Amino acid sequence: MWNPAVYLTYADHRGRPYYDLLSRVDAREPRRIVDLGCGPGNLTRTLTQRWPGAVVEAWDSSEEMVTAARERGVDARVGDVRDWAPLPDTDVVVSNATLHWVPEHPDLLLRWAGQLRAGSWIAFQVPGNFDAPSHRAVRDLVSSARWAHLLRDFPFEKSEVVRPAAGYAELLTDAGCTVDAWETTYVHELTGEKPVLEWIGGTALRPVRAALPDHDWQEFRAELIPLLDAAYPRRADGITFFPFRRIFVVARVKN
């Protein structure tokens, strides 16, 4: 279960890649914009500010996130991105930090590129930090003798969850798109006692939390904390620097 409040703990940090992604989408007067994986809707509603004449459609697989998005005035619905197909007036498809949860997402991108009209845009961003110390620490624990039998379905057990930017560029260029793809590492300045744990608790650790009863979850956290503290030491001034690599792709279906 997704917790919108936990996810929004670092809303400013999580929001910056969204704006960086959309800054490269040069759609002038789109008729319909679709946000796949809209989360709590705090970023989705900015789409209507930029393109006030567009219909904005939002999807998320979490009922809790959809409820939070609707409370912000977003026309959100519960749905799986695998089931989504563009309507004839869809001009922009946006997906922010969602597609890495779908192993077959390259196939979805090819399908969408074939279904969208010429001139339409596909813009997505996915984390590229699955080999970062934070994720390696989680994977090491998940695969340890203590936890492996309880967490055998952990979705990020391998670091090859997403492709590099060049891989997506090749995929969508071959599908008939003009592609702008890049990677950025954000160095987030976090504060608090256990900020990295709090950050990944709202995303990557969610499957672990869902699989474990409370007492096991507390034990797992206790084992993870020193690993994160060693990888991301807190400075004397209270700041913890958290490098986070992200992969961006903006593709336009050719005329």
From Swiss-Prot:
Q: Which SUPFAM superfamilies match?
A: S-adenosyl-L-methionine-dependent methyltransferases
Establish whether keyword Transmembrane is in the entry.
Answer: no
Q: What is its EC number?
A: 2.1.1.144
Top-rank taxon, per record: Bacteria
Mainly resides where?
A: cytoplasm
User: Any idea which UniProt keywords this protein has?
Assistant: Cytoplasm, Methyltransferase, S-adenosyl-L-methionine, Transferase
**Its catalytic activity?**
trans-aconitate + S-adenosyl-L-methionine = (E)-3-(methoxycarbonyl)pent-2-enedioate + S-adenosyl-L-homocysteine
Which cellular compartments is it found in?
A: Cytoplasm
Tell me which Pfam families the record gives: Methyltransf_23
Under the heading InterPro entries, the entry gives: SAM-dependent_MTases_sf (IPR029063), Trans-aconitate_MeTrfase (IPR023506), Trans_acon_MeTrfase_C (IPR023149)
A GO molecular-function term, please? trans-aconitate 2-methyltransferase activity
Q: Which residues cross the membrane?
A: none
Q: Which GO terms describe its biological process?
A: methylation
Cellular component terms (Gene Ontology): cytoplasm
Instruction: List the PANTHER family.
Output: TRANS-ACONITATE 2-METHYLTRANSFERASE, TRANS-ACONITATE 2-METHYLTRANSFERASE-RELATED
Family, per entry: Belongs to the methyltransferase superfamily. Tam family.
Give the function comment from the record. Catalyzes the S-adenosylmethionine monomethyl esterification of trans-aconitate.
The molecule here is called Trans-aconitate 2-methyltransferase
Give the organism, scientific name. Answer: Mycolicibacterium gilvum (strain PYR-GCK) (Mycobacterium gilvum (strain PYR-GCK))
Q: Which gene encodes it?
A: tam
